[in-house]
């Protein structure tokens, strides 16, 4: 089975969020299931020389966009069994950022057209195309509307429904090359919506966790598409993301100062490293709580700013925060750190090496998200044997079971309602167990056995692909 993944970013080449992490690890897991996997993505201008020097030009051709034909280079290389293809066009992709330009509709219309034009030149013709997020959302629509000579089935994955690729209606006529009767399949509230086009036309829709698949069918989480998603629920599946266990391994991670596995003595040494780096008192006995996050409302940062002062004045605890985002939230965290310099430290940067050290050195990790389609940080936290405290939403609900001392089960702590009181109470509850050695050891044993890799999910994707292709054979 040949499966082509289409996405706008992929680790380690380009990354702005969790999509890149998924595309960096899922294909390798699918290869272990016996699938022949390739990935195609834009070749942005800041591709490092390490990768640039390995690329070979497969084919060059022109792609029609608006009234002009644009150059397209198809470049490729193979790494760890995955064939990576890059769509090269400097006009659209050699820019400072990956996203956020006025011609976004034209850029990613070109990308979708270029992917379809590339299909005859790939080493293996795909039996199925797996598209990710709105930037590849036109491909399922082209496959189902007679625009492609030899159409193949498509799977479309929603990584975050908030980002939909909505543009003025003129885009339909000027860019998309669809017949007029297909307008309704892409129109949403007077705009052309790339993501809606994918939902309507793909053979299957997946989300990145089972709970998120249910949540997005409600007005609270559906971002205006809940009605359509409820209508299409029969073809929608929630398949939990995983993390790359080879990449995220505290025993081999080059960023971890004292490598460890199931060894709290070495982990405490890493805590001292964090205390030093974050300029906090070096105390082994004080619980260290960490947060690594984009500093935005949806990540629950306002809950943290509400309770941080009370937390550190009523509990003997340290708080280390790493991330950037909303300037007002950054200012609030700077202010809290200035008020409590011996207990709160905030570094307004994002650096992967420092984040890895923080996962390794912290005792507890907080994720009070308002919504979280899947979340990878709680999985990394489990992998680094750091106890997560999460709000019960999306993938957080699916991965973290709140500790129950009566039966000794659970791999973290969680709260249901999005409010500061419940968040503070849950942190205090976790701290109570931290100070009870027997309970904490039992909790850590549960964490050691938590499954956060891709094996289970890769099998679910494989079964989904086989179901689609089997159905197609029957129909043929």
UniProtKB/Swiss-Prot annotation:
Synthesizes alpha-1,4-glucan chains using ADP-glucose. Coiled coil: none annotated. Pfam families: Glyco_transf_5, Glycos_transf_1. Pathway: Glycan biosynthesis; glycogen biosynthesis. It comes from the Bacteria. This is Glycogen synthase. Belongs to the glycosyltransferase 1 family. Bacterial/plant glycogen synthase subfamily. Keywords: Glycogen biosynthesis, Glycosyltransferase, Transferase. It catalyses: [(1->4)-alpha-D-glucosyl](n) + ADP-alpha-D-glucose = [(1->4)-alpha-D-glucosyl](n+1) + ADP + H(+). GO terms for molecular function: alpha-1,4-glucan glucosyltransferase (ADP-glucose donor) activity; alpha-1,4-glucan glucosyltransferase (UDP-glucose donor) activity. The keyword Transferase applies. It is an enzyme of class 2 (transferase). Its EC number is 2.4.1.21. One of its GO terms (biological process) is glycogen biosynthetic process. ADP-alpha-D-glucose binds at residue 15.
